[in-house]
Amino acid sequence: MARDAKADLIVTVGGGSITDGAKAVQLCLANDITSTEAIDDIRPVKGADGSLGPPPGMKPPAVPQLTVPTTLSAGEFSAISGVTDERYRVKELIRHPGIIPRAVVLDPAVTVHTPEWLWLSTGSGQSTTASRASARARPILTGMRRHCTG
């Protein structure tokens, strides 16, 4: 739809899945990806230093994204998009520094329609992510994290 409409802006209102989907659309538009199978062409590759990054020749997105999040997923601040490969039923990550939305509107009024269970689950998910990151940064916290998370 975005390609047919000759979109010059992608706007999302919703949670992390919507945000991630739009990030993937940005890369698909820029790299002329027109089929599910062709997404393989933009999957991350391991660099000489062992880190994952965009494959050589991947074009950066040309269509910017504006995001209005309604959950606490924080995907609007990440250069990673999670997409499900239905062929293998696995969630894959696509990376490019250019897919971070150019503008994020944080409006609490928009979140009042988010179901409480969803709001709380995305918030607790961020707490888990933060504790994992903290444990990696400070190994002494690993024991504390294990004690807290079981």
How would you describe each model-predicted region?
Residues 80-150:
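Carboxylate- and glycine-rich phosphate/diphosphate-binding segment that chelates Mg2+/Mn2+
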Residues 1, 5, 28, 130-137:
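Generic N-terminal helix/loop capping motif
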Residues 3-13, 17-109:
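Glycine/threonine-rich beta-strand-loop-alpha-helix active-site module
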